[in-house]
Amino acid sequence: MARIAGINIPDQKHTVIALTSIYGIGKTRSQAICAAAGIAEHVKISELSEEQIDKLRDEVAKYVVEGDLRREVTLSIKRLMDLGTYRGLRHRRGLPVRGQRTKTNARTRKGPRKPIKK
C-alpha cells in the first residue's frame, strides 16, 4: 500500500479513484493531480513506480487535505458561532443551517425524536 498524506492508498484501485480516499480530494481534484503528475488515470496504484508515487505525493502536498482541512472547517464553524451570526446560532442549536424547513423533516440534524412527557 502506498502512503500519501498520511493515508494508506488502496493498491488495487485506479489512481483517480484511489486518491479520493484522501479527505479533501474528490474525483475532479484527483483528475487534476494525475494530469499534473503526468500519470494516466486508468493505471492502478500497484503498477506505479516509486518515482511516480513521489510525484503524486508532491502534487497532493500542494492542497489542504486531511487533518489540516478538518481543522480549518471546524475553526470556521467555531468562528461563526463566536460571532453570533445566524448560521452560527443554527450550528449551536443543531438545526439545519441552509434554510431547510424544520416543522417536518430535519431529522438527521435534530437527531431522533424525543417523546413528549405529560
UniProtKB/Swiss-Prot annotation:
GO terms for biological process: translation. PROSITE patterns: RIBOSOMAL_S13_1, RIBOSOMAL_S13_2. One of its GO terms (cellular component) is small ribosomal subunit. It comes from the Bacteria. The keyword rRNA-binding applies. GO terms for molecular function: rRNA binding; structural constituent of ribosome; tRNA binding. InterPro entries: Rbsml_uS13_C, Ribosomal_uS13, Ribosomal_uS13-like_H2TH, Ribosomal_uS13_bac-type, Ribosomal_uS13_CS. The keyword Ribosomal protein applies. Residues 91-118 are annotated as: Disordered. Pfam families: Ribosomal_S13. Keywords: Ribonucleoprotein, Ribosomal protein, RNA-binding, rRNA-binding, tRNA-binding. Located at the top of the head of the 30S subunit, it contacts several helices of the 16S rRNA. In the 70S ribosome it contacts the 23S rRNA (bridge B1a) and protein L5 of the 50S subunit (bridge B1b), connecting the 2 subunits; these bridges are implicated in subunit movement. Contacts the tRNAs in the A and P-sites. Belongs to the universal ribosomal protein uS13 family. PANTHER family: 30S RIBOSOMAL PROTEIN S13/40S RIBOSOMAL PROTEIN S18, SMALL RIBOSOMAL SUBUNIT PROTEIN US13M. Part of the 30S ribosomal subunit. Forms a loose heterodimer with protein S19. Forms two bridges to the 50S subunit in the 70S ribosome. This is Small ribosomal subunit protein uS13. It comes from Photorhabdus laumondii subsp. laumondii (strain DSM 15139 / CIP 105565 / TT01) (Photorhabdus luminescens subsp. laumondii).
